[in-house]
Design a protein with these regions (language model features):
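Acidic, glycine-enriched loop/beta-strand segments at the rims
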Residues: 14-25, 412-422, 428, 474-479, ...
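C-terminal cap of metal-dependent C-N hydrolases
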Residues: 426, 430-437, 442, 456, ...
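A structural motif
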Residues: 58, 83, 192-193, 233, ...
Length: 567
């Protein structure tokens, strides 16, 4: 009879603490780690990890699986990249609390902010909840491969408490604030991980309006976070408005942390050019933590960007007036139309019409690059559309247009919007090296047609550990950032560590085989919707609560994932 449920043999362990690597076995029983060292007893199942690294499961603190966690059992791409815990409800958008009459409004917000087609949400969600605790119960009742936790999102909370006034962004009254504070406390007591909001000006609804939380008074955020203080738990997650300035917006963090006593986490990035204001923000974070508060910045390890292409939500010609004539054609007919000299002349000369802010970002020729297989997320500046045009003596539009024709419309572009200061990863590396910064902003479950960044864990290991082209982290440090450090930032202090008694969330990774593949379009959403997915190779095994959910980069069908209720 086997003494253990599972034994991982002879791996090199990076235990998530950032400490020394250890060559040892790991024994697992009952979903927990029972031994680390030389394990004598046999396992019911065994994994030979010789020559491989063994890590804790990774913790992705910024996802939007609020819908996908209900309509799907696999939280991919995240679970394809070693993530075993995903935090959803970020940016203050989600589906609860919500009265029946407000379903369409929340769909409109989610479609605009997170690029999830409306029909996917209307067809894919049962909407069999009203309150946030009821929503958590629905999530808890489902089956999935990895664990999830959820923030209480500000937009639906505001509309639920204020009705049409909340959607119209009217100031909250004292009664409104008291109601939202009470609902926040109730959400924390039911198992919410915290409260989330967005102040970002380019977060728009599908019809182009501002989301309910845009420009909400800081006093409103203090009141709601008072509900977390009342409950004695919860993390405040916020997307600050980068267009106002991270340093100017940081007062939101300072005031909420001071008034509520709750920790905060937020997204931080560098611009590609201009003054490095992010360094000033790092100083502010240090000040917050030195004074007894806690603030953590989430950093994307590669350029924050969009993926553009004819079959996706954005591409360099989508808002040209003539594009409307062929927008609804199949891609082969679009390409045939683009080969016509008249259409070519029109699309190369026309200016963009007004539209969602994301569309214009695919026309920043200085930071628009080809994305091929294997994908290069840190390309040289001369590979940009502007750089290639300068070398060839033509316009950037022509370079982009010809790429689309040469690839029969299948060619992809990377629009690097930030974290690529002066065309290098230096700023991302420096921010990630900071004691109060963690990797984040994977956005899994959202931006289905424009972003596929949930693969950042694989990228960090590949780019900063294996390649280390000028910007390096050692393996133990990188694993620490992806696991325990990330978990602690949102109050999940017991996760992301390989130690006896810990939950058995584990990766076995073949670093020699580790590769990140070009994003691809899959059509597996409700109502036949499509999304971007990105695969990796090199994950020999991913384990959740002692069950192997993925083996050699393929799902095993195991569904041990659960809802995490509270920190």
């Amino acid at each position: 009879m086997s003494e253990h449920d599972l034994v991982i043999r002879s791996g090199t362990i990076a235990d998530g603490s950032g400490g020394e690597l250890l060559d040892a076995d790991i024994a697992i029983s009952g979903g927990r780690i029972t031994a680390i060292g030389k394990v004598a007893g046999k396992g019911r199942e065994e994994i030979d990890a010789s020559g491989k690294i063994v890590t804790p499961g990774f913790v992705d603190v910024h996802t939007h699986y609020d819908g996908q966690s209900i309509w799907a059992e696999e939280l991919s791409p995240s679970s394809s990249h070693g993530v075993t815990t995903a935090i959803m409800g970020n940016c203050g958008v989600g589906f609860a609390p919500c009265r029946k009459g407000d379903h369409d409004m929340l769909i409109n917000v989610m479609e605009g902010v997170e690029d999830i087609p409306g029909v996917v949400m209307s067809d894919g969600l049962p909407w069999n909840w009203e309150t946030f605790p009821e929503y958590l119960d629905v999530v808890a009742s489902g089956k999935r491969d990895i664990d999830v936790a959820a923030y209480l999102p500000h937009s639906p909370l505001r509309v639920y408490a204020m009705g049409a006034r909340g959607a119209a962004r009217e100031p909250a009254t004292a009664d409104d604030l008291a109601t939202m504070r009470k609902l926040c406390r109730e959400a924390m007591e039911a198992g919410a991980l915290g409260f989330a909001t967005s102040r970002l000006s380019i977060h728009k609804t599908a019809d182009g309006g501002s989301i309910p939380t845009f420009e909400a008074d800081i006093a409103e955020l203090e009141a709601i976070c008072g509900g977390m203080a009342d409950a004695g738990t919860g993390t405040f997650q916020v997307v600050l408005d980068a267009f106002v300035g991270w340093d100017k917006e940081y007062q939101v963090i300072e005031r909420v942390v001071e008034s509520s006593g709750r920790p905060a986490t937020f997204t931080l990035a560098s611009g590609n050019d201009g003054p490095p204001r992010w360094r000033r923000v790092l100083e502010m974070i240090d000040r917050t933590n030195a004074s007894g508060g806690k603030a953590t910045a989430q950093i994307m390890p590669r350029p924050i960007g969009l993926i553009a292409g004819l079959e996706l939500t954005v591409h360099p010609f989508i808002l040209c007036p003539s594009w409307a004539k062929i927008a609804k054609l199949p891609i082969d007919q679009q390409v045939a139309a683009m080969r016509d000299p008249g259409m070519r002349e029109a699309l190369l000369s026309e200016e963009f019409e007004p539209g969602h802010p994301f569309n214009a970002l695919a026309r920043d020729w200085n930071w628009l690059f080809p994305l091929d297989n294997p994908p290069d997320y840190a390309p040289p500046k001369e590979m940009s559309m502007a750089g290639q045009a300068a070398a060839k003596g033509c316009t950037p539009q022509e370079i982009a247009y010809d790429r689309l024709l040469e690839t029969d419309g299948k060619g992809l572009f990377l629009a690097a919007l930030g974290n690529y200061e002066n065309g290098t990863l230096a700023s991302a590396h420096e921010m990630l090296s900071h004691p109060h910064c963690i990797p984040g902003l994977g956005d899994g479950g959202a931006h289905y047609g424009a972003i596929c960044d949930a693969s950042y864990s694989t990228y960090l290991l590949k780019q900063y550990v294996q390649k280390a082209n000028g910007y390096r982290f050692d393996l133990a440090e990188a694993v620490h950032m992806l696991s325990h450090k990330a978990a602690c930032a949102v109050g999940l202090n017991g996760r992301g560590l390989l130690q006896v008694g810990a939950k058995a969330d584990i990766n076995v990774i073949d670093m020699d085989r580790l590769e990140l593949h070009l994003p691809e379009i899959v059509r597996d959403l409700p109502a036949g919707g499509q999304r971007l997915h990105q695969r990796a190779t090199g994950y020999d095994a991913t384990i959740v609560s002692g069950e192997i959910i993925r083996r050699f980069d393929q799902s095993t069908g195991a569904r041990p994932g659960q809802l995490i209720r509270g920190a």
